[in-house]
Amino acid sequence: MSWVQATLLARGLCRAWGGICRAALPGTSISQVPRQLPRGLHCSAAPHSSEQSLVSSPPEPRQRPTKALVPYEDLFGQAPSGERDKASFLQAVQKFGEHSVRKRGHIDFIYLALRKMREYGVERDLAVYNQLLDIFPKEVFRPRNVIQRIFVHYPRQQECGIAVLEQMESHGVMPNKETEFLLIQIFGRKSYPMLKLLRLKMWFPRFMNINPFPVPRDLSQDPVELATFGLRHMEPDLSARVTIYQVPLPKDSTGAADPPQPHIVGIQSPDQQAALARHNPARPIFVEGPFSLWLRNKCVYYHILRADLLPPEEREVEETPEEWNLYYPMQLDLEYSRSGWDDYEFDINEVEEGPVFAMCMAGAHDQATLAKWIQGLQETNPTLAQIPVVFRLTRATGELHTSSAGLEEPPPPEDHEEDDSRQRQQQGQS
């Protein structure tokens, strides 16, 4: 209770007691005195509570009817043909411009369009990105004075423009003059989207051809051709030979009772073939895998045929003649006047592994499929028939995977890793 309410209540009580005392006469009881309501009190039938206020509350403002938001999802599903291509995507952008002349809600629509670009297959189209930037109102978000340039003028709009440029960067799309002209019209030269554009124009030409082993942008959908390219991409020896041991049969040729026939593609170099011929038949070799290899947004799996590292006493050191040695002389001892602080030796952790004799990619990762690969290798490597082969296989969901928005492969559960390690130990002991 506030002090105003307490003052009014005390004043009313004083007046009430005064009226009762004046009305009381000798010989009359208090019950006969007529009840007089004080002027300061306003009694009601409802019980008084401390939450009720004596001051009247202001009238509630009238609520305007809320307008329903435009369902932007429906704009991308109204294509007459029903196909998700570039034409239907641009048609959805055009419908948004016709529906909202004042460009109201353009930021939400641009964010939605950026998420839908992969579904329509236009994530690498520069004209579509320029069309999205053209949705922004022109000459509205440009800073007019120094204060607006110091602080981020219209930050939400600038973040949306940067999001468009970042998606262009992630897909390797180089902006052009039209992109620069649109950003100048929308945000001005002294803005963060324009700074992002200048960085893209600076670093993209420098990093475009930095990969010494480039991967084509459009990869083949044929699993045999994709496996051949993946094996060639991993094998450093140009004289290595790719062999197709088994071709997958079409679905029409195989019946319901016949098992599917996966493809098997292998690669082996002459040096690997010679090393396998020199291998001791008493020591087993291992088929390990599958191991993942990412080719842009596609993931393929491969297996290797390898052996354990020989102990130091069984290793043979090959001496290279001087006329064949490209690094001759091998040792050159020159004494320079160096102090004790000059240390040119670095600590490098090098792990020596056993030799790898061959690699393959198969449509299935079971032991029966890989046994066919070993049988095919025995035709060119007769000594392989005398060497015991141990299969160390892990679990894999499949060969061909296309990455989604995250471009990352989920890690396997921990319990599967423990089971796989136990199986490897048991197979190694056997």
UniProtKB/Swiss-Prot annotation:
GO terms for biological process: cell surface receptor protein serine/threonine kinase signaling pathway; innate immune response; regulation of oxidoreductase activity; regulation of protein complex stability. The lineage of its organism: Eukaryota, Metazoa, Chordata, Craniata, Vertebrata. It comes from Macaca fascicularis (Crab-eating macaque). Signal peptide: none annotated. There is a cross-link at K372 (Glycyl lysine isopeptide (Lys-Gly) (interchain with G-Cter in ubiquitin)). Residues 411-420 have a biased composition (Acidic residues). The gene is ECSIT. This is Evolutionarily conserved signaling intermediate in Toll pathway, mitochondrial. Residues 41-66, 400-430 are annotated as: Disordered. Its main location: cytoplasm. Belongs to the ECSIT family.
